[in-house]
Amino acid sequence: MIMTKKILELIRETSSSLPDDVLKALKAALRKEAKGSSAAVVLKTILDNCAIAKKRGTPLCQDTGTLTFFVDERLRRKVTPNVLKKAVALATAKGYLRKNTIDSITGKSYDDNVTEGAPVIHYVDRSSDSRSSSSSGTSSPTVTLVMKGGGSENMSRQYSLPDSTLGAGRDLAGVRKCLLDAVQKIQGYGCAPGILGVCIGGDRATGFEVAKEQLLRPLDANEESGIRNEELRKLEKRILKEANTLGIGPMGLGGKTTLLGVKIASRPRVPASFFVTVAYMCWACRRRTIELRGQGPSGTTKNAKKRKAL
């Protein structure tokens, strides 16, 4: 029951409070816009909404999204699917989550948000990830929750290169054309300003999995060289800069900030395939981690830190 309460609190905080890096990016975006402009009004409204939601402990957005848990493999016996599902049902009953889970065949609503495949649960090996270590140097297992709304999920897409309609070949120049096309097609439908999580390569399923995991990476992370490809680092910066010159702006109403961040990873591919997969996240980038130290279930809740790919 203690663990269920901790997961319940993780859900409440994730639903009602944005991570610090996302709030910082939204505030920086507001400072760039002309006072009284549509973009400034939208961003100010978003930030006011965030403050109210955090104060009241209520959802940031009416669409509390698909809940995806990433659970350290070392916690498998403590943080079981049953524990997670009980916490989700309690969170729904308390109003931290809306009734948001529908049977795709019958249209029936699962009013507690619990059924086969809901919530989404991944047990992952983090034991060798030095970035999950505590300040004392000991590795602490974690549970990360991501809540992704339907509006942003609908804007995710996948390209297959070469793409003659875009004039995109099988190289980073072609990848760039795909990503800027994705931003143009999203416009205001995905509740901009948003974040792009990208996977270059892999098969179709792996592409979406890895692209979505990029959304766990903090926007303001000073990621050390050697961990990631320098070419991808440069491409992230270029896409962010170019996307923010398109004039799409917050909610597609015009402005200087269309994207808050771009995070790109790559995976090997077979010669016959070259996929570019885009996982789009709206401004309500709800992600949070609970860190469980020691043998007992005590833990501290913190914003999700950078993760290595599954």
Can you describe what each PLM-predicted range is?
Residues 130-134, 298-310:
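Short, low-complexity, charge-dense intrinsically disordered segments
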Residues 1-129, 139-198, 203-299:
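Non-transmembrane, aqueous-exposed alpha-helical and coiled segments at domain scale
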